[in-house]
Amino acid sequence: MCKTVFWGGRRMISLSGVNKRLGSFRLKDISIEIPDGYICELVGQNASGKTTLIKMILGLCRPDDGTVVIDGLNYQEAESDKRIRDITGIVPVNELMNSELSLLENGRCYGRFYSRYDESIYMEYLERFGLDRKIKFGKLSKGQKIKAQFAFALSTAPKYLILDEPTANFDIDFKQDFLNVIMQFMESGKKSVIIASHILDELDRIVDYLIYLDKGELVYSGDIESFRDKYRIISGESYKVKLLKQEDIIHAEDRKYGTKALVVNHGYSKYDGALTVTVPTLEEFMYHYSKRGESAI
């Protein structure tokens, strides 16, 4: 499901003209390039298409149209699925491990399918994450199951690490260790991480590439700094916000002490000293973008 594409001389994950219909839902004309060496956050409201996109990257479903390429490999070519699997670590929403086997047994069972699986690394991560290698996978909590699958994914020495909503079931203490592990994984500079999430604040400080989906459509794909340059939150007295160019306003709503709007940035930091201009957080952007067309002004 991929083709060879280069960005700055480096191979990457690439989707071109991808469409996928699942019942009434449709992923529409998605074209993205995720460079090697980046931590990419895939964001969007529930049912925006994040999991469908990840399944196509993993070869678990195929696009109706378009191509998906990983490291120059296309799933349609003979043996490519095995080669892609060998360089891809997966931490899915659904459970992949056998509930009746211990964590150690699961590692030995599934590790056979990866040429670089290292049991000693798997054991090190299980210990770091506070998991007993002898316990059956089915006896773990939801958060512990994700930790176990995360430990296994890391033990296969992947080039691409793909995680679907991993932090939703983590306790607060582990979330920091999770971020530390991701940063350690990236130290070589030749790997990439894709994290699908609708819980945004804890990932903001490590992400350097962003893909935002809304109702199956691609809203933004690019580096995080370009995203921060592109949009602004403007707050102030309602009549002053109404003076902004209407075509720049994505969504605005009246609040108790004025109006708050998400706008396309065209130098609004210099517009009026009475207006407060800030860079939107991902959470603010998602909130306002999901309500576009409902502006109160």
Which residues does each PLM region occupy?
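The feature captures the beta-strand-to-loop junction immediately N-terminal to the Walker
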Residues: V43-Q45
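ABC-family P-loop ATPase nucleotide-binding domains
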Residues: I90-A148
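Catalytic Walker B motif of ABC-type/P-loop ATPase nucleotide-binding domains
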Residues: L161-E165
